[in-house]
């Protein structure tokens, strides 16, 4: 069985196994990739040498004195040497050198940057260490001792590379090498498009040793001292800050947290003092400042203040004459008397803090002082393995050049000078960001806080916004800059995107142990040209980038950017935790702040606002901290109501903005709710002012869990230290999703408008500010509350997915908008005269009340959510803590509906809601309201009067019973998940997509309505959550779980359908019953597969496998294929949705099995040899008794008394589904069953036989035969004699493009012949009329004018072409993948297109696809979907994995394959290669070409991607896309390669035939020398795959002898061989 044939590597064949250690999540990964021999370095090239040569080549390349270390400023970490570092690099340094200390004789060295850098260079060795897959160190790169050469390039500009000889070297050293070689490497990032190319971040040694240079950063209010200037702080210059209490003239001012004057502490020797205090320090809370207007002061612009703490800064004054205040230098701290600094030789004299280097100093000597990006080429197994291409410097002025003008020019606030004394505090307020409180960002440090140099015209008494300095005197200005400390806080987190390298900043600071305030202020970008020979460096402040995230839906807030006003007077900074690709989007995460240490007391804040008008658009005076708002109100303004935005007519620019962030607001809020918000302002300010209050429509884009700074539910106070000091607590996580394409393409220079203001229109502002023009629906960046892997575009809000969610009818299985909570099937229960189930499990009538409920997303709101969250509960100011929800409205269902039990009399039909009632077609009871109005039922409308709750019919409900949920599981509370669940009911809410997926996990909490009366009321004791408690009686398992969202099944996974039976040969449709279920194969085929994971273990990763074809996009969701037709033209007013079963043949596509919870039997999906996705259904195990009963067609009692464990607990099983086990019951008799567990048993097979009570309207709507008949009638085809089109039998109808509307299609009588009564009256489909267009199927050709002339979508039976993959879409209802596509808008298809795509509503713009070599296929498909591998045999399907591909009909799908090259069960890794069949004849491949290995070869398809999804924050996890990292699900390997080849098949492969051929010749002997972890598996692969059977022609051209010790160097075509150079010895 094991073949041992040995074959040597041929000349024209070489193999590289890139040994790269995988991430912590995936373990070790073996990756194989094969390319042609060529002389230039392409993206796809790897080299490979035998592992036993590695030791020889790298002998003595390791310096044993160097040990790993970690640079704390970035996310780079030197992981343990166990193969876990995914970049195969680590930072190492010599720790034998002693730390830098400053004695009395070395003070000039210590404080002179140049001498300091020179002294540090001689002290310690820093290097990079390369590792192989097994964690073995290969060699060190010590740049200080390296004499590198730049690589040579060919005529196309590509790096010259030979897999064995290595890089061609030019003999020239890189430019400025001598200036940068002594810098410290602190981070490495691998280019995703080139496995040999790395970006190395180098920083000066002063950065690494900053804290040891005795230059601690001390700021005002950092800590309290006793006022004496004699205490020491060990080796650290702790710049002292005097206690504000020491100023007797300022007795009212306190630093919260300072116990007394004598409570100050000093840090221990050698210990650094952090803001907020280290151990032993007293934490300094925010400074309180009180302002109060005199009661008799007139509102004349010059107000008199009764109390004005703002008039005095928290520092001591030496003199006070008039309005001129002189600050003394000793207010800023004292240096140690034993260590004077340059410029001040007087021991003990005060020394204002200055940065280590100013911005201009860094700029003038970039090679020495800036951070440098070094482009390193490194191929571990080549002879010339290392080359350094170029060095680029991150100029701080590239960032400051794009600062807003308000940051570069000191000025007063735009709103004028209100209080002359306040000028003392607002010293040179540069964008509300002054050097006194934030000296790190000012070149002069604390020295510029001296208001002698304000440069302001103090004689200007007009109080206008002409507060700029009189002369452009740079000496007097203090613009926000980027000096040394703040600059290096901005270095870190290297991220490649295309030819752009983005530097987002670090999560710490060079002064981290002393101070945590300096953070990243923006992002640097190094953009290389196509060949990498030149680069440009630019930077954008986060203030600019994040201001692009605005609310587009509300007119009142259009001009308010995120976290800024129109003049960019706020300076957001960010501690970047990491940047990574999630899917195709770039997610930036960290903490963001605009923190300051001064706050304004809550009670006096409103006085300050209304009387002094000192507030600029929501940011109070000195309020530099970021006022983030949560779903529960302002994070730091809990006193403010969350309901309105007030804009006074008299002060339109000055009033604060208040945000109503109730998630349930719609575009048209209810007027009485608006009135409720306005009333407090009316009472206080009068109606004239209140008329300018507008509701804010929550857009769902940001400020959910991201900004939950203060937890109002637990009454946890907002931490002043947290807000002000940029703490790293996880609840401050900030996540922004950036569009990397636009980010990489932004211009180098930002253009601002007049006076730095925004344009009047937000889109004009975009063009003016960024000089780019994104389309209306694609803001170039947006927030996401969760790091979602499921996204349909740059802006999830308003995306196509959201449109689908608006359309999809959410399905309940009985009891208006909810479940029959007792789990009683009315077929097995007696019927009352009203048609209601009595709850007794016996059958007398055989009817069923399980009627699906169709509605729009807004159903399920039992209470008035708008009034609930926006009413009186939100208007409390200063009273008791605001409750989250009104007690009267706790009957909310979390996005689904509620249960309305029987009326007390038992005769009413209150609880049995027919489809006509749910859709508003008739009236029920005594109320006739709008369609689908939840309040139309009397007992559902609960009002509150005092403490009593009353239903509309007057029956009082005990408050405690009605509202108290006593049986909730311990991990759920009534409010814990309500924000998420409530947003599920909203239109245009980004979280709805997440809940769409979370429904599959069953993780959304379910709250049960307590309404009703008497014994029929749902009791608290009935709220059973534990399956084990009720496993004997499933009728009591009343709360749905595991995929059921409050009784609403996910429409993408299930269908509501009617099984139909022709009874008695009458040809009439006499019996029908609705059901919900999945499709399974109806034929007796063996759907055998290995269960990889339980079908219930859904994760967002299961939603994916995106396939784009023309104007159609599809993705797989479980066992279903969801297709959006006309995906790229959503503006046309229609949207198609098609659900196709993946596991049934076309002929049996409509076969359904009905069950309340069909997913319980789903066991996973797989791919057969034809590439079809098939599913495994464990129907025998779960519903065997019910299936047996139905198949026997007689009254039978279930034989299985012991139910299996809950489906989620079922372990891995292998099941064979045989259709013969589910023979439908065709008897016309009544079936009686005492089914005691309807939740775990099959209700009915496809064909059921009895139903005496049914809503005919719903039946007619859902009957597929009748729908098809109506469709044929609508399109003028013969509906009586013409046979059914094959396509109508096999596909779900698609909402298409024809004129008309949905209601007109389905109106009129049914065509079944047996329907009667209301069945002929049509159905009002107003709830689903949001999507216009005909309900059209895939119809055959017709000459009717309403359809195109070619609609023949029947499967092609002539060519024998199998339907392959999940993306097999018919070409006629979607544009073929040709060169031109009209009307493209920016969607994920932008990855395929040249240019911006269609951006206007008028006129199509022809857009061409990119050439195949430019298309990054893997960036289109980022979601693993299906399990492919049999864990027993390791390899499946002749060692070739069928692809999920969507290819034109002209291409034989058998001509593309994915070959398994290696598999390792120990490390759970896989090596794959994509291959394309090239026949011998030079013809374009098509279906007529026979795929015969004897007539052609499978060649590697070299269309590697340029960019790939990243999976970890580690900068080394920048995998090339052609290196396929695996997502491991222990204990089974799970991988999917989702590739669309429709655009790539057209490559003239025959032209590159010789260049693409790759053969394999591996002997068992050579495999045996691999590491123990992979060797045996490789051997098994070779034996099973026959890799050793290399193509004969390749063997013939091989000149190597078998068993050659080393493969020879392949010759260069058309060029003489270069001399073979011996491997260089490490320096």
Curated annotation (Swiss-Prot):
| Record carries keyword Transmembrane | yes
- List, as start-end ranges, the regions of compositional bias called Gly residues: 1307-1320
Tell me any Pfam family this protein matches: P1_N
**Annotated TM spans:** 1527-1547
Question: What is the name attached to this protein's record?
Answer: Adhesin P1
The source's domain of life comes to Bacteria
Quick one: where's region Disordered?
A: 219-238, 252-355, 898-953, 1274-1362, 1589-1627
Question: What triggers or suppresses the expression of this protein?
Answer: Expressed at high levels in all growth phases in vitro (at protein level).
Q: Where is the composition biased (Polar residues)?
A: 224-234, 903-933, 939-953, 1274-1297
Family per record: Belongs to the adhesin P1 family.
What keywords would UniProt list here? Answer: Cell membrane, Cell projection, Cytadherence, Membrane, Signal, Transmembrane, Transmembrane helix
Membrane topology of the entry: Single-pass type I membrane protein
Functional description taken from the UniProt entry: The protein is the major adhesin mediating the attachment of this mycoplasma to respiratory epithelium.
Task: Identify the main location.
Answer: membrane
Q: Where is the composition biased (Pro residues)?
A: 1604-1627
Q: Where is this region: Cytadherence epitope?
A: 1403-1415
Q: Kindly indicate where the leader peptide sits in this chain.
A: 1-59
In its UniProt record, which GO terms are filed under biological process?
A: adhesion of symbiont to microvasculature
Q: Where is the composition biased (Low complexity)?
A: 261-276, 1341-1352
Per the record, where are the segments of Basic and acidic residues compositional bias? 282-297
The organism's lineage?
Bacteria, Bacillati, Mycoplasmatota, Mycoplasmoidales, Mycoplasmoidaceae
């Amino acid at each position: 069985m094991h073949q041992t044939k040995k074959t040597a590597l041929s000349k024209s064949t070489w193999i590289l196994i890139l040994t790269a250690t995988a991430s912590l999540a995936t373990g070790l990964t073996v990756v194989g990739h094969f390319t042609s021999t060529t002389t230039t370095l392409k993206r796809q090239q790897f080299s490979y040498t035998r592992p036993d040569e590695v030791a020889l080549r790298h002998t003595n390349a390791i310096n044993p004195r160097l040990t790993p270390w970690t640079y704390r400023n970035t996310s780079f970490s030197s992981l343990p040497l166990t193969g876990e570092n995914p970049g195969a690099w680590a930072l190492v340094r010599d720790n034998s050198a002693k730390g830098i200390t400053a004695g009395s004789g070395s003070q000039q060295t210590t404080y002179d940057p140049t001498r300091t850098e020179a002294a540090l260079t001689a002290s310690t060795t820093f290097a990079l260490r390369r590792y192989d897959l097994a964690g073995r160190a290969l060699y060190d790169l010590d740049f200080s001792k390296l004499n590198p050469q730049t690589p040579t390039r060919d005529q196309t500009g590509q790096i010259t590379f030979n897999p064995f000889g290595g890089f061609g070297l030019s003999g020239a050293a890189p430019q400025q090498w001598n200036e940068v070689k002594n810098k410290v490497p602190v981070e490495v990032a691998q280019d995703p498009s080139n496995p040999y190319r790395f970006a190395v971040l180098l920083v000066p040694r002063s950065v690494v040793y900053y804290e040891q240079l005795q230059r601690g950063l001390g700021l005002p209010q950092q800590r309290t001292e006793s006022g004496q200037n004699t205490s020491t702080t060990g080796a650290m210059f702790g710049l002292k800050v005097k206690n504000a209490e020491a100023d007797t003239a300022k007795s009212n001012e306190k630093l919260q947290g300072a116990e007394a004057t004598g409570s100050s502490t000093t840090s221990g020797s050698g210990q650094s003092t952090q803001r907020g205090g280290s151990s032993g320090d007293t934490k300094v809370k925010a400074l309180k400042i009180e302002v109060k207007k005199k009661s008799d002061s007139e509102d004349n612009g010059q107000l008199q203040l009764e109390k004005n703490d703002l008039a005095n800064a928290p520092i001591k004054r030496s003199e006070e004459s008039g309005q001129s205040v002189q600050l003394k230098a000793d207010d800023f701290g004292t240096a140690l008397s034993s260590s004077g600094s340059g410029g001040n030789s007087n021991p003990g004299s005060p020394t204002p803090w200055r940065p280590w280097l100013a911005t201009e100093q860094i700029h003038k000597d970039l090679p020495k002082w800036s951070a440098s990006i070094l482009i390193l080429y490194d191929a571990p197994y080549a002879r010339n393995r290392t080359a350094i291409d170029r060095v680029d410097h991150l100029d701080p002025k590239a960032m400051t050049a794009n600062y807003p003008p308000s940051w570069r020019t000191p000025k007063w606030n735009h709103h004028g000078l209100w209080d002359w004394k306040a000028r003392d505090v607002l010293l040179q307020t540069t964008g509300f960001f002054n050097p006194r409180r934030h000296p790190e960002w000012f070149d002069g440090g604390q020295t510029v806080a001296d208001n002698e140099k304000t440069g302001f015209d103090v004689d200007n008494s007009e109080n206008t916004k002409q507060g700029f300095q009189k002369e452009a005197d740079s000496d007097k200005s203090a613009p926000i800059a980027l000096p040394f400390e703040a600059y290096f806080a901005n270095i870190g987190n290297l991220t490649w995107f295309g030819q752009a390298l983005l530097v987002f900043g670090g999560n710490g600071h060079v002064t981290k142990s002393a101070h945590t305030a300096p953070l990243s202020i923006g992002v640097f970008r190094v953009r290389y040209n196509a060949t990498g020979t030149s680069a440009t460096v630019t930077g954008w402040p986060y203030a600019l980038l994040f201001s692009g995230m605005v609310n587009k839906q509300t007119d009142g807030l259009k001009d308010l950017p995120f976290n800024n006003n129109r003049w960019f007077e706020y300076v957001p900074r960010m501690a970047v935790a990491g940047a990574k690709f999630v899917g195709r989007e770039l997610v930036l995460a960290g903490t963001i702040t605009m923190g300051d240490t001064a706050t304004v007391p809550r009670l006096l804040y409103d006085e300050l606002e209304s009387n002094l008008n000192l507030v600029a658009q929501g940011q109070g005076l000195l309020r530099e901290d970021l006022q983030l708002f949560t779903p529960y109100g302002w994070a730091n303004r809990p006193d403010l109501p969350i309901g309105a935005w007030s804009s006074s007519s008299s002060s339109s620019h000055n009033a604060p903005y208040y945000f109503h962030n109730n998630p349930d607001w719609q575009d048209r809020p209810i007027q009485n709710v608006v009135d409720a918000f306005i009333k407090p302002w009316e009472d206080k300010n009068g109606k004239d002012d209140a008329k300018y209050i507008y509701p804010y429509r929550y857009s769902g884009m940001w400020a959910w869990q991201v900004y939950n700074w203060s937890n109002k539910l637990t009454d946890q106070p907002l931490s002043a230290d947290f807000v002000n000091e940029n703490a790293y607590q996880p609840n401050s996580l900030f996540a922004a999703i950036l569009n990397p394409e636009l980010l990489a393409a932004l211009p180098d220079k930002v253009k601002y408008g007049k006076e730095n203001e925004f344009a009047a229109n937000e889109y004009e502002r975009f063009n003016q500010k960024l000089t780019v023009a994104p389309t209306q629906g694609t803001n170039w960046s947006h927030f996401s509350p969760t790091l979602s892997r499921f996204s349909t575009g740059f802006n999830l809000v308003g995306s196509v997915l959201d449109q689908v969610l608006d359309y999809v009818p959410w399905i309940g299985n009985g009891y208006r908008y909810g479940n029959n909570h007792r789990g009683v099937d009315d077929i097995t229960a007696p019927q009352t005269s009203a048609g209601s189930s009595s709850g007794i499990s016996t059958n007398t009538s055989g009817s069923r009340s399980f009627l699906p409920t169709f509605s729009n997303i807004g159903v399920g709101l039992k209470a008035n959510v708008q009034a609930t969250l926006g009413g009186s509960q939100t208007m409390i100011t200063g009273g008791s803590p605001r409750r989250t929800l009104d007690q009267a409205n706790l009957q909310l269902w979390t996005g689904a509906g509620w249960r309305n039990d029987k009326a007390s009399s038992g005769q009413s039909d209150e609880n049995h809601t027919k489809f006509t009632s749910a859709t508003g077609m008739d009236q029920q009871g005594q109320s006739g309201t709008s369609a689908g109005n939840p309040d139309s039922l009397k007992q559902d409308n609960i009002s509150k009067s005092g403490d009593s709750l009353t239903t509309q019919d007057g029956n009082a409900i005990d408050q405690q019973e009605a509202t108290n949920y006593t049986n909730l599981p311990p991990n759920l509370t009534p409010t814990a998940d309500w924000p998420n669940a409530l947003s599920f009911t909203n239109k245009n809410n980004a979280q709805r997509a997440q809940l769409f997926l979370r429904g599959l996990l069953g993780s959304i909490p379910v709250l049960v309505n307590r309404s009703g009366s008497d014994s029929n009321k749902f009791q608290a004791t009935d709220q059973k959550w534990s399956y084990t408690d009720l496993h004997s009686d499933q009728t009591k398992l009343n709360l749905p779980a595991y995929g059921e969202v409050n009784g609403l099944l996910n429409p993408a996974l299930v269908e509501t359908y009617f099984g139909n039976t022709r009874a008695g040969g009458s040809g009439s449709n006499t019996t029908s019953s609705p059901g919900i279920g999945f499709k399974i194969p109806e034929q007796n085929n063996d759907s055998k597969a290995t269960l990889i994971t339980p079908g219930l273990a859904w994760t967002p990763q299961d939603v994916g496998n995106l396939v784009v074809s023309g104007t159609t996009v599809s993705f797989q969701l479980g066992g279903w294929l969801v297709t959006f037709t006309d995906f790229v033209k959503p503006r046309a007013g229609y949207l198609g949705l098609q659900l196709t079963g993946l596991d049934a043949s076309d002929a049996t596509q409509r076969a359904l099995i009905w069950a309340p919870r069909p997913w319980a039997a789903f066991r996973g999906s797989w791919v057969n040899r034809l590439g079809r996705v098939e599913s495994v259904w464990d129907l025998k195990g779960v519903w065997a008794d019910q299936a047996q009963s139905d198949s026997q067609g007689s009254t039978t009692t279930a034989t299985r008394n012991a139910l299996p464990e809950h489906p989620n607990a079922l372990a891995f099983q292998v099941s064979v589904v045989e259709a013969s086990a589910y023979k439908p019951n065709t008897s016309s008799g009544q079936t009686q069953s005492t089914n005691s567990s309807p939740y775990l048993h099959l209700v009915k097979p496809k064909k059921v036989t009895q139903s005496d009570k049914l809503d005919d309207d719903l039946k007619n709507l859902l009957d597929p035969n009748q729908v098809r008949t109506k469709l044929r009638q609508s399109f003028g085809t013969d509906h009586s004699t013409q046979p059914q089109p094959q396509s109508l039998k096999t596909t779900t109808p698609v909402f298409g493009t024809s004129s008309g509307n949905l209601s007109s299609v389905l109106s009129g009588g049914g065509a079944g012949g047996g329907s009667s009564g209301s069945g002929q009256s049509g159905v009002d489909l107003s709830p689903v009329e949001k999507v216009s267009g005909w309900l059209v199927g895939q119809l055959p050709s017709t000459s009717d004018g309403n359809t195109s002339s070619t609609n023949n979508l029947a499967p092609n039976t002539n060519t024998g072409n199998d339907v392959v993959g999940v993306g097999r879409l018919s070409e006629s209802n979607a544009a073929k993948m040709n060169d031109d596509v009209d009307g493209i808008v920016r969607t994920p298809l932008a990855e395929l297109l040249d240019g911006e795509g269609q951006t206007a509503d008028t006129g199509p713009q022809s857009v061409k696809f990119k050439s195949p070599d430019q298309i990054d296929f893997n960036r289109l498909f980022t979601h693993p979907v299906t399990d492919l591998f049999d864990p027993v045999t390791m390899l499946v399907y002749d060692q070739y994995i069928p692809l999920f591909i969507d290819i034109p009909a002209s291409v034989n799908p058998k001509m593309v394959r994915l070959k398994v090259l290696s598999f390792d069960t120990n490390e759970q890794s896989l090596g794959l290669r994509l291959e394309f069949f090239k026949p011998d004849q030079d013809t374009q491949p098509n279906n007529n070409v026979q795929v015969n290995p004897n007539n052609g070869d499978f060649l590697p398809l070299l269309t590697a991607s340029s960019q790939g999804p990243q999976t970890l924050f580690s900068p080394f996890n920048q995998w090339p896309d052609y290196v396929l990292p695996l997502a491991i699900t222990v204990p089974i390997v799970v991988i999917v390669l989702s590739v669309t080849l429709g655009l790539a098949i057209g490559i003239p492969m025959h032209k590159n035939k010789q260049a693409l051929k790759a053969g394999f010749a591996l002997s068992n002997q050579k495999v045996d020398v691999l590491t123990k972890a992979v060797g045996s598996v490789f051997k098994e692969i070779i034996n099973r795959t026959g890799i050793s059977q290399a193509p004969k022609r390749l063997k013939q051209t091989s000149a190597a002898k078998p068993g050659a010790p080393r493969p020879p160097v392949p010759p260069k075509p058309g060029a003489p061989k270069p001399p073979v150079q011996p491997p260089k010895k490490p320096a």
